[in-house]
């Protein structure tokens, strides 16, 4: 669950205030048109959530209790069941559970290429799904599991971003010819060490400052934007001044009790750790660390290049949430707002378009079957995934390298990822669950391939940690623009686009 809605326009503020905040945090590489259309809907979707049954904390005057000017406090441990119930109650919506969608179907519509459906397979049963659609909305989230995570072995999925978000939405869009943006702005979360629990609740809830092992407050030294907070922590550790902490020692009993409750709602392992150690945050500062990098549009603007209506560069294909690029700092309400925009735009689209000439799903069915017909391969999907994460960690700016990368290392990463992609073709699946894992690795490897080209292309360090280029350690105004990508004839092609000022529509 979550304990706050982090995107809300409180009294005394207007949507454009949020645009400016996100623009500053993203060092200018954002889409103001997308941000504004989201911010205009934040409060509306917040009220929708409350009507669904979400408990939003209120003061004695019946006003929402805010945490800063853009956050609203909630009791959000049940937010996902509430949303799932809302979807399942709709008469005209059919939900297919335990189905893995792998590819988009392409056809010709009104004389140009268009997405006309999707294909996938059942995870439990040997079933192929061939779905026709007048329009498709991708809302699959971003990509986790590209880099070696903080914790090894059994605990490797104790991570910030859901391990089930494999980048599949990015991958199927790329294969369909859709343009992506800003993958080079990776997201690294500042978290409580080992539990990977959120730190914002402590920093904002009790005003805890970031301190090094000597007790020195260092956050003002490096800056307080999202990447700067992590950059400071990495630098202090690199200089031998770690471990680093959030200074909670000395907080009141009431504040400690509130932290126990808050973490039980969203990250129980943190509260359990305090109890197990016999010392809570009042007695001991909370150690912090950065996670491995993720590709997540809701935080760092990486994802599909969309117009103001959230349509991608391929006709009939829309994107919303973490998979959609251009608009960082979305959080829950931003994702819901974007879903609303994409849904309404898709409805308008299907009313206007003409006859479809579509392609068969037969080729994908044959591809699924091929993995069952392979002889037992020398590598398993798990071997390939582990090798991929090691490559990205060591050669594409992971935790091991302090998030830094250079062109020489990226060259190695490019070659090794290509070799691993070839290995995936030969993987053997013993059942449908195995096939699912093979496809998850396939999606991640394609996202890695595209990410590496983005890291090559931005020859500057615009965002510390998120894009820490050791060859080009300074910000360069020559890169005041978007770095986009698409796949042309099987190869990643980089596209440089100028910054968008007002309303944007696709023209090429």
What kind of feature is each model-predicted range?
Residues 133-135, 139-140, 320-321, 454:
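Short, well-ordered coil/turn residues at beta-beta hairpins
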Residues 351-432:
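Long, amphipathic alpha-helical stalk/connector segments used for oligomerization, subunit docking
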Residues 125-135, 313:
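Core beta-strand elements of the Rossmann-like FAD/NAD(P) dinucleotide-binding domain
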Residues 43, 50-105, 114, 182-331, ...:
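Mobile, glycine/GP-rich and aromatic-enriched active-site lid/loop segments adjacent to catalytic centers
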Residues 1-21, 200-202:
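Conserved N-terminal glycine-rich FAD pyrophosphate-binding loop of Rossmann-like flavoproteins
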Residues 138-197, 332-345:
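Glycine-rich loop(s) and the adjacent beta-strand/alpha-helix scaffold that form part
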Residues 21-43, 69-70:
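Dinucleotide-binding Rossmann-like beta1-alpha1 core, especially the glycine-rich loop
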Residues 312-372:
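Catalytic phosphate/nucleotide-handling subdomain of diverse soluble enzymes
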């Amino acid at each position: 669950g979550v304990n706050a809605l982090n995107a809300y326009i409180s009294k005394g503020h207007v949507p454009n205030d949020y645009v400016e905040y996100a623009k500053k945090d993203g060092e200018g590489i954002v889409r103001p048109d997308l941000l504004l259309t989201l911010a205009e809907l934040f409060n509306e979707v917040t009220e929708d959530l409350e009507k669904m049954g979400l408990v939003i904390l209120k003061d004695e005057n019946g006003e929402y209790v805010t945490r800063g000017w853009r956050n609203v406090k909630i009791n959000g441990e049940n937010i996902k069941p509430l949303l799932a119930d809302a979807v399942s109650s709709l008469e005209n919506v059919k939900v297919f559970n335990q189905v893995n969608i792998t590819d988009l179907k392409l056809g010709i519509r009104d004389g140009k290429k268009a997405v006309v459906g999707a294909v996938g397979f059942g995870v439990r049963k040997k079933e192929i799904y061939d779905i026709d659609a007048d329009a498709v909305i991708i809302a699959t989230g971003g990509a986790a599991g590209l880099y070696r995570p903080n914790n090894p072995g059994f605990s490797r999925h104790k991570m910030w971003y859901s391990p089930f978000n494999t980048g599949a939405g990015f991958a199927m869009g790329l294969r369909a010819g859709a343009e992506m943006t800003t993958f080079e702005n990776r997201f690294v979360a500042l978290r409580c060490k080992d539990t990977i629990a959120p730190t914002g609740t402590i920093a904002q809830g009790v005003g805890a400052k970031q301190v090094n092992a000597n007790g020195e407050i260092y956050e003002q030294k490096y800056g307080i934007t999202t990447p700067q907070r992590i950059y400071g922590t990495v630098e202090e550790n690199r200089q031998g001044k770690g471990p680093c902490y959030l200074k909670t020692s000395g907080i009141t009993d009431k504040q400690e009790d509130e932290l126990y409750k808050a973490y039980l709602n969203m990250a129980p392992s943190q509260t359990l750790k305090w109890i197990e150690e016999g010392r809570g945050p009042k007695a001991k500062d909370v150690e912090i660390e950065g996670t491995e990098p993720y590709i997540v549009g809701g935080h760092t603007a990486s994802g599909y290049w969309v117009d103001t209506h959230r349509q991608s560069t391929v006709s009939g294909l829309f994107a919303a949430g973490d998979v959609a690029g251009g608009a960082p700092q979305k959080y829950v309400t931003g994702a819901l707002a974007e879903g609303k925009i994409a849904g309404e735009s898709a409805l308008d689209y299907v009313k206007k378009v003409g006859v479809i000439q579509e392609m068969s799903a037969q080729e994908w069915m044959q591809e699924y079957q091929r993995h069952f017909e392979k002889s037992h391969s020398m590598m398993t999907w798990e071997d390939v995934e582990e090798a991929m994460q090691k490559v990205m960690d060591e050669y594409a700016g992971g935790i091991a390298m302090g998030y830094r990368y250079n062109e020489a290392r990226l060259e190695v990463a490019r070659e090794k990822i290509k070799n691993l992609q070839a290995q995936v073709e030969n993987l053997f699946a013993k059942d449908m669950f195995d096939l699912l894992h093979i496809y998850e690795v396939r999606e991640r490897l394609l996202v890695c391939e595209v990410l590496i080209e983005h890291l090559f292309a931005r020859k500057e360090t615009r965002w510390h940690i998120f894009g820490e280029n050791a060859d080009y350690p300074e910000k360069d105004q020559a890169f005041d623009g978007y770095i986009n990508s698409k796949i042309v004839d099987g190869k990643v092609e980089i596209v440089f686009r100028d910054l968008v000022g007002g309303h944007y529509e696709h023209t090429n």
